[in-house]
Amino acid sequence: LSAHKVGGPLGIGALILRRAVEIPALLHGGGQEREIRSGTLNAPAIVAFAAAAKSKYYDATSISALRDSFIAGITSVLPEVIINGLKSDRLPGIVNVTFPGTQSDTLLLLMDAQHISCSTGSACSAGVHEASHVLLAMGHSEVSAQSSLRFSFGATSTHADVDFAVSVLPDVVTRGRAANLS
């Protein structure tokens, strides 16, 4: 669990691991943290993470409502979009959407011009210009996977943010499709 996902600081997180499970060391050295990650603990960040985890700052129910509002909005204005993943397995703050007939890189630039942050994939694949291996594993074609964007919602996201994103998406997708044809 990354602290920043619940309103805590960047660079700190938690790993829950059964004692019987062995994983290779991330950092070698003094043997702290069951020899998985050696080094001095960042006590202030740990305390801030704990405070964030206990606070009402990150409310999964509210964030799920924003996500669901976004899904309802984009499927209303763009009925051809595909919402990826099973509804029952969705995380509160993440939606991955396929926009048929577009290229995700083009959509990303057009959304950025509207001051809307989204991504062509997970944070760990940022800067990689390949189809999402997750979408490919889910059975999507290469073309479909390269027509997808990931939208994330967090504690600072608002209904106004959702409404604005939904309002600009039809024009962004139209322009993205036109660029894809040229």
Model-derived segments and their meaning:
Residues L1-S182:
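Pyridoxal 5′-phosphate
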